[in-house]
Amino acid sequence: INNNFYPEFDGITLRKNLAVFYNNKYNMNFDEENFIIGYGASGLLSLIGEVFLCCGDELVTSQLTFESYEISAKRNGAHYVEVPTKENLQINLDGILDAITKKTKMIIICNPNNPTGMILKEEEIKNFIMKVPENVIIVVDEAYFEFIDIPNYKSMMQMIGNYPNVIVIRTFSKVYGLAGARVGYAIMNKEISVNLIKGVEFASSLSALEGAIAALNDVEFIKKTKEVIKEGREYLSKEFKKLGFKVFPTQTNFIYVDTKLDTKFIAEKLKEKGILIRGDLLLSRITVGTMKQNKRLVSAIKDIISNEVL
């Protein structure tokens, strides 16, 4: 890679590769104009917000979901509307439909959801999309889609042809292991991409774009990664249940856990043992690591619980 040159500002080569990849995988009819490359999924969320949201608009989404949605809304002066989840923490699609008003410009559905890891039934999302007014942009965040372990479960890319208000977001940060490269992409109707592409200055760095192209077709790496994550997910779920924790069903590379303990205290003790957990999510959302890392985490938690009064 000759980094003496600037990258393609719109990532056209990667976009062409993505079109071929999904046409072959899902029997779609995409071309490069159906794709936009961005600085990670978060960068794309910012871009989409800048184009479609303004002061007084509403962005409707679920409670207990990815924090960047709220940032995107408030950055553009839009009102952020959170719809409570169902009792089992699943996204309440009917509730989101009920929350739509004349001011609603955008809806975001994270599937699988972050931080819960839970997934919606394919038919539920399809029916939901059909009921949303056509003037409302529907963003389906599928950042963790590749981890789904359900045979024949289809992406909402399938809806783009008939529903031009649908945008699907994907990323190379998760299953492809390129979080530091910051390469995300959005799939959409060409009518929408024409407006979004105007906001792209440089999609990403030259090295990141080339790395994404190489990773896209690395079938063996993806297969191995999914196997490692599935094994680690099952191990952590089993061990946490033994400790009396409530473990929510997940289709991602992390698990959502209700410990019913003083999570801030445990996080501090884990930090003393060289194990860091993000912010105030603490023991709620735990990313699956290597088996060595997973066992070290479980051992540390057991040690803390047995030696401290919580």
Where are these regions (language model features)?
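N-terminal small-domain helix-loop-helix segment of the aminotransferase-like
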Residues: 1-42, 47, 308-310
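Short Gly/Ser/Thr- and Asp/Glu-enriched loop/turn motifs at secondary-structure junctions
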Residues: 32, 248-254, 279-283
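PLP-dependent aminotransferase-like
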Residues: 51-109
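PLP-dependent enzyme catalytic core of the Aspartate aminotransferase-like
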Residues: 123, 264, 268-310
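Conserved PLP-binding catalytic core of the aspartate aminotransferase-like
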Residues: 234, 239-273, 288
